[in-house]
């Protein structure tokens, strides 16, 4: 049967066009119920005598409940799936996963193309009303189709939809009533709080006008926001809450060319970190400098948590954490554009990890208790939840989702999702780290594992005879990695040539020989984006049979590789470059320490040691050449732990030491990545995946320049070369001074990012930190999906494979790059959070005194960096909340905090002695406290 579907579509130019689509209606779409006598049961999923049909809002708002195994035999209509897909892609992915899970009875019914359930839109009928009518028609069809064999129930919280369903003879209930009928009270905790359009179980309350005080301004409607954006009254951007001060946020604005600062929760107006918001600038006389920020209106105080030292500008405290209150006007802080949120364009709500605020148990038991949830992420406000399990949850880490935030409520409302484990338990806190950073740590599915070759695997005769694969097993190949490394991506070789030159080879695991485009394995790797390295755990991007065996370039086994081979002169000039698929057999899997020991031991003259020394000599020349071009030699506070093999607690902690062997391997990996970038861009100028490092703005470098000026140091930041030279000249009285300056420079930089070459102009491809016009990632395909992508590009450039179709879809390529950046960032944050967790565990039983360096002056003290442990945190000179009033003042120009009588002062980069100890100011909330000695 053929039907015409008519709808209006808005063009890019803003005009409305009538669209007509032909719809073919079918009579061979089955209901999916085993009890049905007229439909083919081979595709049936629904076995219960009670089947529920859910509407769009139930799926959108109650997905946490639907994922609970107590909810089953659910019909998800195609019209519901389409609307969910348009409104919330994350929820759409979750409901699709439920529908495809063979262990769950969720059945997708294509009502939009079934001859008996197709619904033609009526004139002047809204899209929402049309969808609701389609849901009712499909539910009524199910009722009549199944008759007495199954009870069919429409579950909806839409008051009007439920009323019409009842009038039309359809059985309908609210989600709350349905859950109560199941006789499992704990499921009620999973219910999202109702919105204004929803039905509550106490409808009488809806008619009573609220007498509660309005705390927040009403959000503007989207029509007004859109008009305001066009007129330049409002500014759109992503709200980013300061990680070190949850009452201060920033919205980047292209229209005014700088960030708009949002001070205080009232001006944030119920916006969450990551929300896309519309911001209105405050009158200029209300723009504030940093010293004007007050958080006295809130119960909470400014963040005083000890953190791992930041690695880039995104992690570092904002300069506005400084007070510029001084004894003279010459040091007054400049005002910054300040604004307030007038509307939320797109929410970034997701599930959050944390615990309930300590409270006494209410009298009686079994009833509903109201509790405040405190997220581990301090950027997130407290969340109100109702729970019937309060006694069991008070000492637990739990997951909570946000449902709404009313103007009359100081805090958002949400619902309990699930427990994680006991507060303070190492496994629990590690799982919190993974959830908070959106790291997928679920086991690989059977569909993914089915893509793997059977074990044991070995190089086949077909691999050896493959004309595109060169046999390099005769070469002395070796790998150099951290100790205990099992997922070995890369190996090297260095051979002296008769003409006095060297042949250098970088051999990378040939992951794409096993991970094919469009397979479940490839889809899973693409979603995960990267492996995640925690202190005592690794979350793999690919299944372990690949990462630790089939692809890993282990010693004394033959493996498939993708090789970059250069001929180099003795002064490390590249004479020629070639790329080839290869077969190698690694002779040794060395640790950095082992490789360094070989190079340093003059008694060793074997071939492997000689090759290492030759490579190291060439690497030093290459490194110096990069530095001469302007590459930055920055520093970060990498921390390493010695772990107890029995209880897995940290035994010792210290800064990671970089050896020449580390730098040698890094140099050849960089060179391989640069060579591959040039090759793929030459052949595929519009669809290559590259990596760029944006040049830092003067504003981003301002904290470094202020610190340098305060200690009499002049830094030239006009180019990466000028900055590199300035950093080389920054030599202080102690040997750690230069490294500290480099650490401060590092945190002024943004992160490097992946991008599609067709999205930017060639000058924007530049990698600032490496001083390289072109760069990509090729050398770690076991642990980074970006490298898998680049391997496919390189293979296609050599004519080995055809370029996969994804490379012809620019928007999809951009989406892939965005996801890779998101996953890479989250992996880094998870790694840092894991280190911070183990630092806390280490100091629980080891209070200690240690030297620290002042890195930032605040109004009531200063931030110190502890070099031995790579951590930083606040040291208070006055009581928290006093903001330095009375006893101390800040000299902004000299970057020091001075006692009013002049008897004592502390300056930036000064060495101080501190005491480090874990304290517990609130139950179950331990923190590392730093105090001045």
UniProtKB/Swiss-Prot annotation:
GO molecular function: endonuclease activity; exonuclease activity; metal ion binding; RNA binding; RNA nuclease activity
InterPro entries named among the record's database cross-references: Dis3_CSD2, NA-bd_OB-fold, PIN-like_dom_sf, PIN_dom, RNase_II/R, RNase_II/R_CS, RNR_Ribonuclease, Rrp44_CSD1
Pfam families named in the record: OB_Dis3 (PF17849), PIN_4 (PF13638), RNB (PF00773), Rrp44_CSD1 (PF17216), Rrp44_S1 (PF17215)
Residues where Mg(2+) binds: 481, 490
Domain CSD2: 371-438
RNB domain segment(s): 469-798
BP-aspect Gene Ontology terms: rRNA processing
Upper classification of the organism: Eukaryota, Viridiplantae, Streptophyta, Embryophyta, Tracheophyta
Record region (Disordered): 296-336
Gene symbol of the encoding locus: RRP44A
Positions of the CSD1 domain: 217-321
The enzyme's E.C. designation: 3.1.13.-, 3.1.26.-
Null allele phenotype: Aborted development of female gametophytes.
Protein's name in the database: Exosome complex exonuclease RRP44 homolog A
Boundaries of every PINc domain copy: 50-163
Family named by the database record: Belongs to the RNR ribonuclease family.
């Amino acid at each position: 049967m053929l039907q015409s579907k008519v709808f209006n579509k808005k063009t890019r130019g803003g005009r409305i066009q009538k669209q007509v689509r032909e719809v073919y209606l079918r009579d061979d779409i089955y209901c999916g119920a085993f009890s049905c006598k007229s439909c083919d049961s081979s595709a049936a999923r629904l076995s219960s005598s009670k089947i529920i049909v859910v509407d769009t809002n139930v799926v959108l708002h109650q997905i946490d409940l639907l994922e609970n195994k107590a909810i089953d035999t659910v019909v998800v209509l195609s019209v519901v799936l389409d609307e969910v897909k348009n409104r919330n892609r994350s929820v759409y992915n979750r409901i699709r996963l439920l529908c495809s899970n063979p262990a769950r009875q969720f059945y997708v019914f294509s009502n939009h193309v079934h001859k008996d359930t197709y619904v033609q839109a009526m004139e002047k009928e809204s899209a929402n009303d049309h969808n609701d009518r389609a849901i009712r028609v499909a539910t009524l069809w199910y009722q009549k189709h199944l008759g007495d064999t199954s009870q069919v129930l429409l579950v909806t919280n839409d008051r009007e939809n439920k009323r019409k369903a009842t009038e039309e003879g359809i059985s309908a209930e609210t989600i709350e009533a349905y859950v109560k009928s199941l006789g499992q009270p704990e499921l009620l905790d999973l219910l999202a709080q109702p919105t204004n359009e929803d039905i509550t179980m106490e409808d009488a309350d809806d008619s009573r006008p609220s007498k509660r005080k309005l705390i927040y301004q009403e959000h503007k409607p989207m029509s007004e926001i859109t008009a305001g954006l066009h007129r330049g009254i409002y500014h759109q951007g992503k709200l980013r809450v300061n990680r070190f001060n949850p009452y201060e946020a920033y919205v980047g604005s292209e229209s005014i060319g700088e960030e708009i600062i949002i001070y205080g929760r009232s001006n944030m107006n119920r916006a969450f970190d990551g929300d896309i918001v519309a911001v209105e600038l405050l009158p200029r006389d209300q723009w504030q400098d940093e010293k004007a920020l007050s958080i006295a209106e809130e119960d909470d105080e400014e963040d005083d948590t000890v953190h791992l030292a930041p690695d880039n500008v995104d992690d570092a405290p904002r300069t506005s954490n400084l007070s510029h209150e001084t004894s003279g006007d010459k040091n007054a802080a400049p005002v910054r554009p300040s604004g307030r949120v007038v509307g939320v364009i797109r929410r970034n709500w997701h599930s959050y990890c944390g615990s309930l605020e300590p409270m006494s148990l209410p009298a009686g038991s079994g009833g509903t208790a109201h509790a405040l949830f405190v997220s581990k992420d301090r950027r997130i406000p407290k969340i109100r939840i109702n729970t019937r399990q309060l006694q069991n949850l008070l000492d637990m880490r739990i997951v909570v989702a946000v449902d709404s935030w009313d103007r009359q409520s100081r805090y958002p409302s949400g619902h309990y999702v699930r427990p994680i484990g006991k507060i303070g338990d190492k496994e629990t806190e590690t799982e919190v780290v993974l959830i908070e950073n959106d790291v997928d740590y679920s086991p690989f599915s059977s569909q993914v594992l089915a893509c793997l070759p059977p074990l044991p695997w070995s190089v086949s005769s077909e691999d050896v005879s493959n004309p595109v694969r060169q046999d390099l097993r005769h070469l002395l190949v070796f790998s150099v990695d951290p100790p205990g490394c099992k997922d070995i991506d890369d190996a090297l070789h260095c051979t002296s040539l008769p003409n006095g030159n060297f042949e250098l080879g970088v051999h990378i695991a040939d992951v794409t020989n096993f991970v094919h485009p469009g397979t479940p394995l490839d889809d899973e790797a693409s979603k995960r984006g990267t492996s995640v390295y925690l202190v005592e755990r690794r979350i793999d991007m690919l299944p372990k049979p690949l990462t630790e065996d089939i692809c890993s370039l282990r010693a004394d086994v033959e493996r498939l590789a993708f090789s970059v081979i250069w001929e180099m002169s003795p002064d490390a000039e590249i004479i020629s470059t070639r790329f080839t698929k290869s077969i190698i057999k690694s002779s040794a899997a060395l640790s950095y320490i082992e490789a360094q020991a070989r190079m340093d031991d003059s008694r060793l003259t074997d071939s492997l040691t000689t090759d290492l020394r030759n490579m190291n000599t060439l690497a030093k020349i290459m490194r110096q050449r990069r530095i001469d071009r302007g590459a930055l030699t920055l520093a970060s506070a990498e921390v390493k732990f010695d772990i107890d093999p029995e209880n897995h607690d940290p035994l010792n902690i210290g800064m990671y030491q970089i050896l020449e062997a580390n730098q040698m391997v890094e140099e050849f990996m960089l060179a391989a990545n640069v060579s591959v970038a040039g090759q793929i861009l030459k052949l595929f100028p519009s669809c290559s995946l590259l990596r760029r490092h944006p040049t830092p703005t003067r504003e981003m470098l301002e904290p470094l320049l202020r610190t340098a000026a305060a200690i009499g140091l002049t830094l030239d930041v006009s180019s990466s070369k000028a900055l590199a030279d300035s950093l080389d000249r920054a030599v202080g009285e102690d040997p750690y001074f230069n490294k500290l300056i480099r650490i401060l420079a590092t945190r002024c930089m943004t992160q490097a990012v992946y991008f599609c070459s067709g999205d930017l102009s060639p000058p924007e491809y530049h990698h600032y930190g490496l001083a390289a016009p072109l760069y990509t990632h090729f050398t770690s395909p076991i642990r980074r999906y970006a490298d898998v992508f680049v391997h496919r590009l390189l293979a296609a450039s050599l004519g080995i494979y055809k370029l996969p179709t994804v490379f012809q879809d620019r928007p999809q390529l951009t989406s892939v790059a965005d996801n890779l950046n998101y996953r890479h960032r989250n992996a880094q944050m998870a790694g840092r959070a894991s280190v911070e967790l183990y630092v806390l565990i280490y100091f629980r039983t080891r209070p200690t005194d240690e030297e620290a360096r002042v890195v930032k002056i605040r109004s009531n003290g200063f931030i110190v960096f502890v070099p031995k442990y790579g951590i930083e945190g606040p040291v208070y000179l006055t009581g928290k909340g006093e903001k330095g009033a009375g006893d101390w003042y800040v000299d902004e120009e000299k970057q020091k905090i001075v006692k009013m009588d002049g008897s004592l002062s502390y300056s930036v980069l000064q060495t101080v002695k501190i005491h480090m100890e874990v304290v517990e100011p609130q139950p179950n909330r331990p923190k590392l406290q730093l105090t001045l000695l």
